Each structure stands twice: as C-alpha cells, then as structure tokens.
C-alpha cells in the first residue's frame, strides 16, 4: 500500500477556533489528528476559510473532531466552505455542524 505524500495542510488554535489551512486530504488527516485533538478543549469553531479542498478523509477528521467537541459539551460551528465539503456532507448526510441527523 502506498504511503500518502506529505501534505501542505496545517492547523493552529486561535481563541475558540481551530483554524485549518491547505488541503484536508488523506495525508493531512493522518498528520493533523494528534495535533488537532490536543488543541480541541474549548473549541467552538472550525475555521476552514483557508482550506483549499476536502476529501473523504478530511471530512472524517473534521466530523470526528466535531463529535469529540460535542461530547465535551460544545456545539462547534463550521466557518468556510472549501471545495468538496458540501458534496461530501450531502453524500454522508451530515448536518452543517458535521453531525448525523437524529
């Protein structure tokens, strides 16, 4: 199995937000998981305005982070609509908050 190429994606904490940039793809999801999870406490927003594209692995990363945030009592909002996000949310029937409807 081929190893995904290094990604240009990165993440930083800014107040109550996790701010993502670059392509959220398979390589990014693997690279960013530990870093994002370590910064998740108190997050209310996922800022995607500097994300260039999202694939299914990137969506899985965001949805899992959102689930962890909800479990801690937050209701994270998503800001920005990178290429691929809306189509994948529709395909997986996710709400705008990256949750499965009840």
Predicted feature descriptions by range:
Residues 1-57, 63-102:
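STAS-like cytosolic regulatory interaction modules
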């Amino acid at each position: 199995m081929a190893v995904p190429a290094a990604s240009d994606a990165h993440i930083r904490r800014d107040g109550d937000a996790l701010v993502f940039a670059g392509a959220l793809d398979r390589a990014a999801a693997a690279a960013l998981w530990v870093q994002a999870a370590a910064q998740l406490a108190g997050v209310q927003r996922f800022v995607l305005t500097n994300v260039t594209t999202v694939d299914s692995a990137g969506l899985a990363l965001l949805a899992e982070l959102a689930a962890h945030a909800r479990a801690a009592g937050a209701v994270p909002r998503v800001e920005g609509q990178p290429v691929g996000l809306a189509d994948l949310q529709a395909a997986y029937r996710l709400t705008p908050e990256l949750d499965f409807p009840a």
